[in-house]
Amino acid sequence: MLSLRLLTIIAGFALAGSASAASIGIVAPQSGPYELLGQQVRQGAKAAAAKLGLDVVEIHESCEDGSGGAIADGLVAAKVSTAIGFLCTETLQDVLPPLKAAAIPAITLSSRAPILMEDALKYGWPLFRLAPSDRAESDRIAEIILRDWKGHSIGLVDDGTIYSRELVDRIRSSLEENGLKPTLADTMRPNQEQQVALVRRLARTGISHVFVGAERTDVAIIARDAGSENIPLTLMGGDAMNAANNPVPLAANVLAVTRPAYDTLPSAQAVAGELRGAGIEPEGYVLPAYAAAELTAALAEATQAQSKPAPEILAGGTLFKTVLGDLGFNPSHDLSDNPYRLQRWNGQRFEPADKAERQ
Protein backbone atom coordinates (compact mmCIF):
# COMPACT_ATOMS: atom_id res chain seq x y z
CA MET A 1 0.00 0.00 0.00
CA LEU A 2 1.29 3.46 -0.84
CA SER A 3 2.46 5.43 2.18
CA LEU A 4 0.07 8.09 3.36
CA ARG A 5 3.09 10.38 3.59
CA LEU A 6 3.43 10.41 -0.17
CA LEU A 7 2.35 13.80 -1.48
CA THR A 8 1.52 14.81 -4.99
CA ILE A 9 2.42 18.44 -5.50
CA ILE A 10 0.63 20.05 -8.39
CA ALA A 11 2.31 23.16 -9.79
CA GLY A 12 2.02 25.30 -12.88
CA PHE A 13 -0.87 27.53 -11.87
CA ALA A 14 -0.87 31.29 -12.35
CA LEU A 15 0.90 32.04 -9.10
CA ALA A 16 2.44 28.62 -8.48
CA GLY A 17 6.10 28.58 -7.63
CA SER A 18 5.85 31.84 -5.73
CA ALA A 19 7.07 31.58 -2.16
CA SER A 20 4.10 33.65 -1.03
CA ALA A 21 1.47 31.68 -2.95
CA ALA A 22 -1.29 30.26 -0.80
CA SER A 23 -1.70 26.52 -0.96
CA ILE A 24 -4.58 24.13 -0.49
CA GLY A 25 -4.33 20.60 0.81
CA ILE A 26 -6.85 18.27 -0.82
CA VAL A 27 -7.45 15.23 1.38
CA ALA A 28 -9.68 12.78 -0.46
CA PRO A 29 -9.73 9.11 -1.49
CA GLN A 30 -7.68 8.34 -4.59
CA SER A 31 -8.64 4.66 -4.67
CA GLY A 32 -11.06 2.28 -2.99
CA PRO A 33 -14.84 2.47 -2.62
CA TYR A 34 -14.89 6.28 -2.28
CA GLU A 35 -12.59 7.01 -5.22
CA LEU A 36 -15.38 8.57 -7.30
CA LEU A 37 -16.29 10.96 -4.48
CA GLY A 38 -12.63 11.80 -4.04
CA GLN A 39 -12.40 12.54 -7.75
CA GLN A 40 -15.27 15.01 -7.44
CA VAL A 41 -13.43 16.80 -4.62
CA ARG A 42 -10.20 16.97 -6.62
CA GLN A 43 -11.93 18.18 -9.79
CA GLY A 44 -13.71 21.02 -8.04
CA ALA A 45 -10.84 22.16 -5.86
CA LYS A 46 -8.23 21.97 -8.61
CA ALA A 47 -10.43 23.86 -11.08
CA ALA A 48 -10.77 26.73 -8.60
CA ALA A 49 -7.09 26.53 -7.63
CA ALA A 50 -6.03 26.89 -11.26
CA LYS A 51 -8.19 29.98 -11.60
CA LEU A 52 -7.07 31.54 -8.30
CA GLY A 53 -3.37 30.68 -8.41
CA LEU A 54 -3.34 28.31 -5.46
CA ASP A 55 -0.65 25.70 -5.11
CA VAL A 56 -2.18 22.25 -4.64
CA VAL A 57 -1.10 19.43 -2.37
CA GLU A 58 -3.00 16.17 -2.83
CA ILE A 59 -3.03 13.49 -0.14
CA HIS A 60 -4.79 10.14 -0.34
CA GLU A 61 -7.47 9.55 2.29
CA SER A 62 -7.73 5.83 3.02
CA CYS A 63 -10.57 6.24 5.55
CA GLU A 64 -8.80 3.77 7.84
CA ASP A 65 -8.61 4.18 11.61
CA GLY A 66 -5.26 5.64 12.65
CA SER A 67 -4.47 7.14 9.24
CA GLY A 68 -4.91 10.77 10.27
CA GLY A 69 -1.50 11.24 11.88
CA ALA A 70 0.41 10.59 8.66
CA ILE A 71 -1.97 12.82 6.72
CA ALA A 72 -1.42 15.62 9.23
CA ASP A 73 2.36 15.20 8.92
CA GLY A 74 2.08 15.67 5.17
CA LEU A 75 -0.09 18.76 5.44
CA VAL A 76 2.13 20.39 8.04
CA ALA A 77 5.31 19.58 6.10
CA ALA A 78 3.82 21.11 2.96
CA LYS A 79 2.79 24.22 4.94
CA VAL A 80 -0.64 24.32 3.35
CA SER A 81 -2.81 27.34 4.07
CA THR A 82 -5.98 25.28 4.48
CA ALA A 83 -6.84 21.60 4.15
CA ILE A 84 -10.16 20.56 2.62
CA GLY A 85 -12.00 17.35 1.81
CA PHE A 86 -11.97 14.90 4.72
CA LEU A 87 -14.80 12.67 3.58
CA CYS A 88 -14.24 10.22 6.44
CA THR A 89 -14.60 10.85 10.16
CA GLU A 90 -11.90 8.23 10.80
CA THR A 91 -9.35 10.59 9.27
CA LEU A 92 -10.22 13.64 11.32
CA GLN A 93 -9.79 12.24 14.82
CA ASP A 94 -5.99 12.06 14.51
CA VAL A 95 -5.40 14.80 11.97
CA LEU A 96 -6.83 17.68 14.01
CA PRO A 97 -4.39 18.03 16.96
CA PRO A 98 -1.32 18.56 14.70
CA LEU A 99 -3.28 20.98 12.51
CA LYS A 100 -4.20 22.97 15.62
CA ALA A 101 -0.51 23.38 16.46
CA ALA A 102 0.18 24.54 12.89
CA ALA A 103 -2.90 26.83 12.73
CA ILE A 104 -4.17 25.04 9.61
CA PRO A 105 -7.98 24.92 9.26
CA ALA A 106 -9.53 21.62 8.24
CA ILE A 107 -12.72 22.03 6.21
CA THR A 108 -14.74 18.85 5.88
CA LEU A 109 -17.17 18.58 3.01
CA SER A 110 -19.13 15.66 4.40
CA SER A 111 -18.57 14.70 8.05
CA ARG A 112 -21.56 15.40 10.28
CA ALA A 113 -20.38 13.42 13.34
CA PRO A 114 -21.66 15.41 16.35
CA ILE A 115 -19.25 13.84 18.86
CA LEU A 116 -16.24 14.77 16.73
CA MET A 117 -17.36 18.40 16.57
CA GLU A 118 -17.98 18.42 20.32
CA ASP A 119 -14.38 17.28 20.82
CA ALA A 120 -13.14 19.87 18.32
CA LEU A 121 -14.82 22.70 20.22
CA LYS A 122 -13.66 21.32 23.57
CA TYR A 123 -10.01 21.04 22.56
CA GLY A 124 -9.84 23.99 20.18
CA TRP A 125 -9.27 21.91 17.06
CA PRO A 126 -9.61 23.88 13.79
CA LEU A 127 -12.43 21.78 12.28
CA PHE A 128 -15.05 23.57 10.18
CA ARG A 129 -17.97 21.95 8.36
CA LEU A 130 -19.35 22.80 4.95
CA ALA A 131 -21.69 19.85 5.43
CA PRO A 132 -24.73 20.97 7.43
CA SER A 133 -25.25 19.50 10.87
CA ASP A 134 -28.11 17.14 11.71
CA ARG A 135 -29.46 19.90 13.96
CA ALA A 136 -29.68 22.25 10.98
CA GLU A 137 -32.04 19.86 9.21
CA SER A 138 -34.40 19.41 12.15
CA ASP A 139 -34.32 23.13 12.98
CA ARG A 140 -35.40 24.09 9.46
CA ILE A 141 -38.14 21.45 9.32
CA ALA A 142 -39.56 22.55 12.68
CA GLU A 143 -39.41 26.19 11.58
CA ILE A 144 -41.43 25.42 8.43
CA ILE A 145 -44.01 23.32 10.29
CA LEU A 146 -44.47 26.05 12.90
CA ARG A 147 -44.88 28.64 10.16
CA ASP A 148 -47.17 26.75 7.76
CA TRP A 149 -48.93 23.92 9.58
CA LYS A 150 -50.50 25.58 12.60
CA GLY A 151 -54.21 24.81 12.74
CA HIS A 152 -53.78 21.49 10.93
CA SER A 153 -53.73 17.92 12.26
CA ILE A 154 -50.05 17.02 12.09
CA GLY A 155 -48.45 13.59 11.96
CA LEU A 156 -44.77 12.75 12.46
CA VAL A 157 -43.62 9.40 11.07
CA ASP A 158 -40.16 7.82 11.34
CA ASP A 159 -38.87 4.63 9.74
CA GLY A 160 -37.36 3.13 12.87
CA THR A 161 -33.72 3.86 11.99
CA ILE A 162 -31.57 5.71 14.50
CA TYR A 163 -31.13 8.68 12.17
CA SER A 164 -34.85 8.97 11.46
CA ARG A 165 -35.92 8.54 15.08
CA GLU A 166 -33.47 11.17 16.29
CA LEU A 167 -34.51 13.56 13.51
CA VAL A 168 -38.22 13.20 14.32
CA ASP A 169 -37.56 13.43 18.07
CA ARG A 170 -35.74 16.74 17.61
CA ILE A 171 -38.56 18.06 15.42
CA ARG A 172 -41.23 17.02 17.93
CA SER A 173 -39.33 18.57 20.84
CA SER A 174 -38.95 21.85 18.98
CA LEU A 175 -42.63 21.92 18.03
CA GLU A 176 -43.79 21.21 21.57
CA GLU A 177 -41.42 23.80 23.02
CA ASN A 178 -43.21 26.30 20.77
CA GLY A 179 -46.70 25.17 21.77
CA LEU A 180 -47.53 22.90 18.83
CA LYS A 181 -48.25 19.29 19.74
CA PRO A 182 -48.47 16.81 16.85
CA THR A 183 -51.70 14.83 16.67
CA LEU A 184 -49.88 11.57 15.92
CA ALA A 185 -46.35 10.20 16.14
CA ASP A 186 -45.87 6.82 14.48
CA THR A 187 -43.19 4.44 13.24
CA MET A 188 -43.56 2.87 9.81
CA ARG A 189 -42.06 -0.33 8.43
CA PRO A 190 -39.64 0.73 5.68
CA ASN A 191 -38.85 -1.07 2.43
CA GLN A 192 -42.38 -2.40 1.95
CA GLU A 193 -44.11 -2.76 -1.41
CA GLN A 194 -47.10 -0.78 -0.17
CA GLN A 195 -48.06 1.50 2.74
CA VAL A 196 -51.86 1.40 2.47
CA ALA A 197 -52.29 0.46 6.14
CA LEU A 198 -50.23 3.49 7.24
CA VAL A 199 -52.12 5.82 4.90
CA ARG A 200 -55.48 4.59 6.19
CA ARG A 201 -54.30 4.92 9.80
CA LEU A 202 -53.32 8.53 9.16
CA ALA A 203 -56.73 9.18 7.57
CA ARG A 204 -58.65 7.61 10.47
CA THR A 205 -56.75 9.84 12.89
CA GLY A 206 -57.69 12.90 10.86
CA ILE A 207 -54.13 13.72 9.83
CA SER A 208 -53.93 16.16 6.93
CA HIS A 209 -50.24 17.11 7.09
CA VAL A 210 -47.45 14.64 7.77
CA PHE A 211 -43.69 14.78 7.98
CA VAL A 212 -42.08 11.45 7.08
CA GLY A 213 -38.52 10.79 8.19
CA ALA A 214 -37.71 8.02 5.72
CA GLU A 215 -35.92 7.25 2.49
CA ARG A 216 -37.25 8.77 -0.71
CA THR A 217 -38.69 5.48 -2.01
CA ASP A 218 -40.72 4.95 1.16
CA VAL A 219 -42.13 8.48 0.92
CA ALA A 220 -42.91 7.89 -2.77
CA ILE A 221 -44.87 4.73 -1.87
CA ILE A 222 -46.85 6.62 0.80
CA ALA A 223 -47.67 9.36 -1.73
CA ARG A 224 -48.69 6.79 -4.34
CA ASP A 225 -50.92 4.86 -1.95
CA ALA A 226 -52.51 8.04 -0.56
CA GLY A 227 -53.40 8.98 -4.12
CA SER A 228 -54.89 5.58 -4.90
CA GLU A 229 -56.95 5.76 -1.69
CA ASN A 230 -58.09 9.32 -2.51
CA ILE A 231 -56.66 10.57 0.79
CA PRO A 232 -55.41 14.18 0.41
CA LEU A 233 -52.24 14.18 2.50
CA THR A 234 -49.73 17.01 2.48
CA LEU A 235 -46.46 15.06 2.60
CA MET A 236 -43.04 16.43 3.50
CA GLY A 237 -39.72 14.63 3.83
CA GLY A 238 -36.21 15.63 4.84
CA ASP A 239 -32.76 15.60 3.27
CA ALA A 240 -33.10 11.89 2.44
CA MET A 241 -35.46 12.97 -0.34
CA ASN A 242 -32.45 14.21 -2.28
CA ALA A 243 -31.95 10.83 -3.96
CA ALA A 244 -32.63 8.99 -7.21
CA ASN A 245 -36.23 8.98 -8.42
CA ASN A 246 -36.53 5.19 -8.54
CA PRO A 247 -37.67 2.48 -8.26
CA VAL A 248 -40.96 4.21 -7.35
CA PRO A 249 -41.36 7.65 -8.98
CA LEU A 250 -42.21 10.47 -6.60
CA ALA A 251 -45.61 12.05 -7.16
CA ALA A 252 -45.74 15.74 -7.97
CA ASN A 253 -46.38 18.14 -5.06
CA VAL A 254 -44.50 16.12 -2.44
CA LEU A 255 -42.43 18.51 -0.33
CA ALA A 256 -38.90 18.16 0.97
CA VAL A 257 -36.65 20.17 3.24
CA THR A 258 -33.30 19.62 1.63
CA ARG A 259 -30.39 21.44 0.04
CA PRO A 260 -30.96 22.85 -3.44
CA ALA A 261 -28.94 21.29 -6.23
CA TYR A 262 -25.75 23.34 -6.15
CA ASP A 263 -25.62 23.90 -9.90
CA THR A 264 -29.05 25.57 -9.77
CA LEU A 265 -27.87 28.33 -7.41
CA PRO A 266 -27.61 31.75 -9.10
CA SER A 267 -24.08 32.14 -7.74
CA ALA A 268 -23.03 28.87 -9.37
CA GLN A 269 -24.39 29.31 -12.89
CA ALA A 270 -21.25 30.72 -14.51
CA VAL A 271 -18.85 28.29 -12.86
CA ALA A 272 -21.11 25.32 -13.59
CA GLY A 273 -21.03 26.30 -17.25
CA GLU A 274 -17.25 26.63 -17.21
CA LEU A 275 -16.86 23.23 -15.60
CA ARG A 276 -19.15 21.55 -18.12
CA GLY A 277 -17.16 23.22 -20.88
CA ALA A 278 -14.06 21.57 -19.42
CA GLY A 279 -15.75 18.18 -19.32
CA ILE A 280 -16.49 18.24 -15.57
CA GLU A 281 -20.07 17.66 -14.46
CA PRO A 282 -20.76 19.92 -11.43
CA GLU A 283 -22.29 17.16 -9.31
CA GLY A 284 -21.70 15.73 -5.86
CA TYR A 285 -18.74 17.35 -4.14
CA VAL A 286 -17.46 19.27 -7.18
CA LEU A 287 -18.98 22.66 -6.35
CA PRO A 288 -18.51 22.40 -2.54
CA ALA A 289 -14.83 21.66 -3.18
CA TYR A 290 -14.66 24.59 -5.60
CA ALA A 291 -16.16 26.81 -2.90
CA ALA A 292 -13.68 25.50 -0.32
CA ALA A 293 -10.82 26.46 -2.63
CA GLU A 294 -12.29 29.95 -3.10
CA LEU A 295 -12.57 30.24 0.66
CA THR A 296 -8.94 29.11 1.01
CA ALA A 297 -7.70 31.86 -1.30
CA ALA A 298 -9.74 34.59 0.39
CA LEU A 299 -8.80 33.34 3.84
CA ALA A 300 -5.11 33.46 2.98
CA GLU A 301 -5.49 37.12 2.02
CA ALA A 302 -7.43 37.88 5.21
CA THR A 303 -4.83 36.11 7.34
CA GLN A 304 -2.07 38.22 5.86
CA ALA A 305 -4.05 41.47 6.06
CA GLN A 306 -5.23 40.97 9.65
CA SER A 307 -2.14 39.20 11.01
CA LYS A 308 -4.40 36.64 12.67
CA PRO A 309 -4.36 32.83 12.52
CA ALA A 310 -6.67 31.44 9.85
CA PRO A 311 -8.78 29.37 12.30
CA GLU A 312 -9.43 32.48 14.39
CA ILE A 313 -10.70 34.39 11.35
CA LEU A 314 -13.01 31.53 10.35
CA ALA A 315 -14.39 31.14 13.86
CA GLY A 316 -15.04 34.89 13.97
CA GLY A 317 -17.86 34.61 11.45
CA THR A 318 -16.20 36.31 8.47
CA LEU A 319 -18.22 35.79 5.29
CA PHE A 320 -16.50 34.79 2.05
CA LYS A 321 -17.99 35.03 -1.42
CA THR A 322 -18.01 31.63 -3.11
CA VAL A 323 -19.73 29.70 -5.85
CA LEU A 324 -22.23 28.54 -3.21
CA GLY A 325 -22.94 32.09 -2.08
CA ASP A 326 -21.60 33.87 0.99
CA LEU A 327 -20.14 31.28 3.36
CA GLY A 328 -19.14 31.75 6.97
CA PHE A 329 -19.08 29.80 10.20
CA ASN A 330 -20.77 30.30 13.54
CA PRO A 331 -19.06 29.83 16.94
CA SER A 332 -19.88 26.10 16.71
CA HIS A 333 -17.83 25.92 13.49
CA ASP A 334 -20.95 25.06 11.47
CA LEU A 335 -22.27 27.08 8.55
CA SER A 336 -23.69 30.37 9.80
CA ASP A 337 -26.51 30.18 7.23
CA ASN A 338 -28.72 27.10 7.36
CA PRO A 339 -28.55 25.69 3.79
CA TYR A 340 -31.78 23.68 4.00
CA ARG A 341 -34.68 25.02 1.96
CA LEU A 342 -38.30 24.05 1.41
CA GLN A 343 -38.73 22.52 -2.04
CA ARG A 344 -41.52 20.93 -4.03
CA TRP A 345 -41.25 18.04 -6.50
CA ASN A 346 -42.69 19.13 -9.85
CA GLY A 347 -42.59 15.67 -11.40
CA GLN A 348 -39.08 16.13 -12.79
CA ARG A 349 -37.05 17.96 -10.16
CA PHE A 350 -37.28 19.81 -6.88
CA GLU A 351 -37.93 23.53 -7.12
CA PRO A 352 -38.17 26.23 -4.42
CA ALA A 353 -41.49 26.44 -2.58
CA ASP A 354 -42.79 29.38 -0.56
CA LYS A 355 -45.25 27.43 1.57
CA ALA A 356 -45.54 23.82 2.73
CA GLU A 357 -48.95 23.12 1.18
CA ARG A 358 -50.31 21.02 -1.68
CA GLN A 359 -50.96 22.76 -4.97
Q: What function would you assign to each model-found segment?
A:
Residues L2-I10, A21-Q359:
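Extracytosolic ligand-binding ectodomains
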Residues A16-A19:
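N-terminal signal peptide c-region/cleavage motif recognized by signal peptidases
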